[in-house]
């Protein structure tokens, strides 16, 4: 499966032994070339995460973070605090082609009150979790404006239990929001 291959490549990416910027550039290019076929859709192939075999609706919830935080999350087996009372997740899928990353950051910042979402790189990566019995749906909604001016509504969820089991982490990767 592409997700397993991508996860494997992501965990193999080690730069601690790299001693020069040329080596780092070469290492990153090789890693990028290895994972490119795993993350880019083929001709007439959708990138919608729900069509890649993920469950729909309340089944998958997404955490948006930067890459270093995501890696700490994986290795530590816990969610980061990105909300006043724990971890904020949402049902906004990471391959939403009609929403820009800036708009996603605005919505996350508004929903969480977390100043870190002012920088788009703070939400360039996602982790998808399946643990609906451990989250609370918040009363507010996250309203985003699409690239066509349409109002899109997503639900924020909170988890105060920050530890997670390995099987609850379904996928992770780089977000593919609209550029703009």
Swiss-Prot record:
One of the protein's GO biological processes: cytokinin biosynthetic process
Disulfide-bond pairs as recorded: none
GO MF annotation terms: beta-glucosidase activity
Organism encoding this protein: Panax ginseng (Korean ginseng)
Top-level enzyme category: hydrolase
Protein name: Cytokinin-beta-glucosidase 3
Entry keyword set: Cytokinin biosynthesis, Glycosidase, Hydrolase
EC number: 3.2.1.-
Taxonomic lineage: Eukaryota, Viridiplantae, Streptophyta, Embryophyta, Tracheophyta
